[in-house]
Amino acid sequence: MKTGLILEGGAMRGMFTAGVLDVLMEQGITVDGMVGVSAGAVFGCNYKSHQIGRTIRYNTTYCNDKRYASFRNLLRTGNLYSEDFCYHEVPEKLDPFDDKAFRESPMDYFVVCTDVRTGDPIYHKCRTGDAEDVRWMEASASMPLAAKIVKIGHYGLLDGGVADSIPIRFFESIGYKRNLIILTQPKGFVKKKNPMLPVIRARYLRYPAFVEAVADRHERYNETLSYISMLEQSGKDYVIRPPIPLEIGAMERDPDQLRRVYETGRAVAQIQVDKIRAFLETANAEAEE
């Protein structure tokens, strides 16, 4: 039995996740494996590479840089978040991603993408943190309408949150029976049908299975939340979530807003750190029995 960490996406609500992860790293809290979705995928990699503060640092540094994210990028390239700047210039030069530490960490790391042809989730294990792995992370965070379809091998991929927003059942199926789950919505949140569905239906006319996955995403999401609530109440899994709605834009240009959400994550984690540690110690003890 293995311990896992599951990271929901949510665009810049992911700063909450970044705050939680930095506290976990500072406290030396680790798990056997983790899986990230969308923002959870591109921010969570820094937990495996143990780069405390990197996520909030590069986001606050470049949030006002049009090379990073802008509607100009979207009109010129089809990507709101620049592929070249976000996934090459920043991690390779400006704020280097430590792929060596990522590769040497014993923690398994998975990302979730959505296959646009089938509407199904694709779960990819990132082993080295190399350019191909970063490409999978990019695909996981490529939001419909805001990013081009990412081609990897024979796949056409978009945001993993469409097919599997919180991949608890996937992680259970591969042996992660006791999990920390970081959500980016408060308790009681209920997802509604995507109001952009007519636009998505028109934009992805060639991919009807993907459109249907978008159409019923809210139903699958809410059912997964109910399942997670049951796991939480039974003590099998431990859920970390913001106390109130985070209220931050998908493309946030105010570094103070990014820091506010990040500090909310830190505060929640600091309050709960002893409970988190106790949960994992109990899970590890059970695994040894």
PLM-predicted stretches and their roles:
Residues M1-V37, C45-E289:
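Patatin-like phospholipase
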